[in-house]
Design a protein with these regions (language model features):
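N-terminal active-site beta-alpha-beta segment that forms phosphate/nucleotide-binding
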Residues: 79-165
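Conserved phosphate- and dinucleotide-binding cores of soluble alpha/beta proteins
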Residues: 1-79, 147-206
Length: 206
């Protein structure tokens, strides 16, 4: 699941002389079939065996392993927000922006939802009953469904498809979007945008 992203990241790291550390559930003595080996050993510098973790039931909604009816999206979204360490934007300003931006949506639009305030656009699309008339996407590879807000942003509830991030950006770069709502770290009065670095923080992804 989403294994292509892991390969793309490993290839990029090695191409830039970085070190690749792979986290796995377990080590095995019997080699996998070649077609099942997503990351070749020559790209791996170290392996870490992860300790078993207790999994919250709410996160099952994000696996894509079972279908979630449209009528249950609200219920699952609320469950996920309750267990999220990072709460979604819910300020007056964020809601005003999100509500206004959602009015730009048209039937059959393919839409990219960015992190931060753009998450509110998805919420207002849901409240207005437009979710089943448009296709929401997120950069991490989810298409269709409803983007999860807060800590788990990047995942989708009720996704129609989940594929690799590189394929998602192929869709974006080739003009497959009708509208895109993006967040920003800083914006000045002239509309210049800083999406890379803030005070006392690591460089953002831009």
């Amino acid at each position: 699941f989403m294994s292509g992203d892991a390969l793309s990241i490993c290839q990029a790291v090695k191409a830039n002389r970085g070190k690749v550390i792979v986290q796995v559930d377990r080590l095995v003595d019997t080699p996998s079939r070649p077609r099942n080996a997503i990351i070749p050993g020559c790209l791996v510098d170290a392996i870490v065996v992860a300790e078993p973790e207790e999994k919250n039931e709410a996160y099952k909604a994000l696996t894509g392993s079972f279908e979630i009816p449209y009528e249950e999206w609200n219920q699952w979204s609320e469950k996920l927000e309750q267990v999220s360490a990072k709460q979604p934007k819910n300020t007056t300003v964020a809601n005003i922006i999100g509500k206004r931006a959602a009015k730009e949506l048209r039937v059959d639009d393919i839409v990219n939802i960015g992190i931060g305030i753009p998450e509110t656009v998805a919420r207002f699309a849901r409240k207005s009953g437009m979710l089943d008339m448009i296709t929401l996407t997120v950069e991490s590879g989810g298409i269709g469904g409803f983007p999860v807000s807060g800590e788990a942003f990047g995942a989708m509830i009720g996704a129609a498809s989940v594929y690799d991030m590189a394929n998602q950006f192929d869709l974006y770069d080739n003009g497959g979007l009708d509208v895109c709502f993006m967040g920003a770290l800083e914006v000045d009065k002239e509309g210049n945008i800083n999406a890379h670095r803030g005070p006392g923080a690591f460089a953002g992804i831009g």
